[in-house]
Every structure is written in structure tokens, then in C-alpha cells.
């Protein structure tokens, strides 16, 4: 099945008239839907129109969602859980719907390419360290809009800043794999002690591990999850590194640190 995903950061750069590096918060706020960049639209208004069309027209046609106001609240609650483990009971309770309805609505959001559920990685024995997937949006700009964020300053100050950056990088990785004709299957890692790697990309029978950090300066804690995964699964790890919110990539002794701006140069 053909997936028409939002643009990549590299594709968005083709619409820019300046060679100046983009502002990270503005990138997250604007998102990557082609029409916004092609026509130079105001992202807040364009995303409002997009969501209204999706809810009011498309949902009436493709699904029996009768309580549109409650469904909209449900989607906004999903945005508030960006980057978190999916808990349908909690999500349903907060939205005022049953677990069954919450599951049906999540499935609907998946099939209409609004949200993506990133599964946990499991060993060859089938043992999962956690069972729940993590929730992300196909377009981080839509997540920002659903959260009520309307300016880059609001995005940069929001408590979900790190999760929104993580969402952005994970979707860039998915688009990169699909554009290269590879499987979109990706995972995250979390062990019983809570050590986590944000993204595992299959490379043959092994994994490339990526830790994602929104901070503009490198912190030694950024490497904790990578070190844990390497220690526990040395035969699985083929390579790894950190993608962070700083402007300059760095070569560290154990793990390379890549600036998010390097994604502009992807083919």
C-alpha cells in the first residue's frame, strides 16, 4: 500500500528562499504537510482547516464516529501523550469513552495516518521488556496545533518540547526508510530498570540504535541508554549514536552525536 507521508526536512528546504539554518521550534510548529510549504500558508490556519476537514468530512464518510466533539477531545488528548506509552484505559477515561471505543479510535487514527504507534523491541525469544507501544503523530506540526501551540516561543517552552522533537526525528527516520524502499518497521527499547533507547532501526538481523535529545548542548546522560543496550545486547547492536537539538555535530569517543540540521542533507 502506498503511504503518502508528509515531507522530509530535506524536501522542505527546497521551498526555502534563504540558506540560513532553519529554526527548530519553527520547524516543529509548521510541520511538514506539503500544501503549507508549497503555498506558503499560515501553519496554524492551514492545520485548523486540515483537522476540521478530516473530522467533519472524512470521518463522517469512513467511520461511524457520531460524537465528533468527544472524538476531537480524544485526539487532543493523544497529542498531550506524544512520545508516551499508550495507555488506552487512561486515555479512554480522560476522554469519557470506553476502552473499546478508545481502541477503535486509535485504530482509526492509525489507518488515516494521523498517529503512529512505535512498538517495543523484543528479543529473539519473543520476550518483550514492555508491551505497550509509544504514541507519535505522523506530522509534528499537527501535534503542536492540537496542543494549542501557535508560536515558536510557545513550542520551545512547552513541557512536551523534548517529546515533540523526538516525534519529529522518529518520523524523519520512517520517511527516510520508506523513501529508500526499506521496511518502515522500527522499534524502541526499554528494560525493566527503565533504561531506554528512543529508536532502533533494523539493519539486516541487527539494530542501529538512536538516542534523541532536544537539548542544544551534549550531556553525558545522553549516552546512558545506548551504553545499557550495548552491554545487554552486544550481538544485536551494529551501530548507534545521538541526534540532538544543537547546531554542530560532534565526534565522541564512543558514540557520534549528530545535529538535527544534518537531516537537511538527506537525499
Stretches with model-predicted labels:
Residues 245-267:
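Domain-level recognition of nuclease-like catalytic cores that cleave nucleotide substrates
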Residues 212-220:
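Short beta-strand-loop-alpha-helix junction that forms the active-site gateway
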Residues 190, 213, 243-244:
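Short beta-strand/turn micro-motifs composed of small residues
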Residues 1-10:
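A short helix-turn-beta junction within AAA+ P-loop NTPase domains corresponding to the substrate/partner-engaging
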Residues 178-179, 228-236:
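Arginine/glycine-rich "motif VI" loop of SF2 helicases in the C-terminal RecA-like domain
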Residues 41-207:
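Accessory nucleic acid-recognition modules appended to NTPase machines
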Residues 223-232, 243-246:
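Catalytic core segments in nucleotide and nucleic-acid processing enzymes
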Residues 17-53, 61:
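Amphipathic alpha-helical "lid/sensor" segments that cap RecA-like P-loop NTPase cores
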Amino acid at each position: 500500500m502506498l503511504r503518502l507521508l508528509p515531507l522530509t526536512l530535506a524536501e522542505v528546504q527546497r521551498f526555502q528562499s534563504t540558506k540560513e539554518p532553519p529554526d527548530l521550534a519553527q520547524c516543529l510548529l509548521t510541520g511538514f504537510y506539503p500544501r503549507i510549504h508549497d503555498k506558503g500558508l499560515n501553519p496554524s490556519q492551514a492545520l485548523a482547516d486540515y483537522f476540521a476537514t478530516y473530522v467533519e468530512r472524512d470521518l463522517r464518510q469512513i467511520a461511524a464516529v457520531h460524537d465528533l466533539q468527544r472524538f476531537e477531545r480524544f485526539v487532543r488528548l493523544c497529542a498531550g501523550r506524544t512520545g508516551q506509552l499508550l495507555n488506552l484505559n487512561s486515555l479512554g477515561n480522560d476522554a469519557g469513552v470506553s476502552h473499546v471505543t478508545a481502541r477503535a479510535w486509535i485504530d482509526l487514527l492509525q489507518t488515516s495516518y494521523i498517529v503512529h504507534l512505535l512498538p517495543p523491541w523484543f528479543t529473539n525469544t519473543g520476550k518483550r521488556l514492555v508491551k505497550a507501544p509509544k504514541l507519535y503523530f505522523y506530522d509534528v506540526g499537527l501535534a503542536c496545533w492540537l496542543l494549542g501551540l501557535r508560536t515558536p516561543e510557545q513550542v520551545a517552552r512547552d513541557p512536551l518540547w523534548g517529546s515533540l522533537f523526538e516525534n519529529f526525528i522518529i518520523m524523519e527516520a520512517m520517511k527516510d526508510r520508506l523513501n529508500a524502499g526499506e521496511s518502515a518497521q522500527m522499534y524502541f527499547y526499554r528494560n525493566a530498570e527503565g533504561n531506554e533507547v528512543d529508536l532502533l532501526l533494523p539493519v539486516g538481523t541487527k539494530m542501529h540504535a538512536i538516542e534523541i535529545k532536544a537539548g542544544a548542548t551534549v550531556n553525558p546522560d545522553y549516552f546512558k541508554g545506548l551504553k545499557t543496550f550495548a552491554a545487554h545486547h552486544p550481538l544485536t547492536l551494529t551501530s548507534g549514536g545521538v541526534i540532538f537539538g544543537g547546531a554542530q555535530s560532534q565526534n565522541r569517543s564512543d558514540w557520534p552525536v549528530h545535529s538535527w540540521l544534518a537531516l537537511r542533507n538527506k537525499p
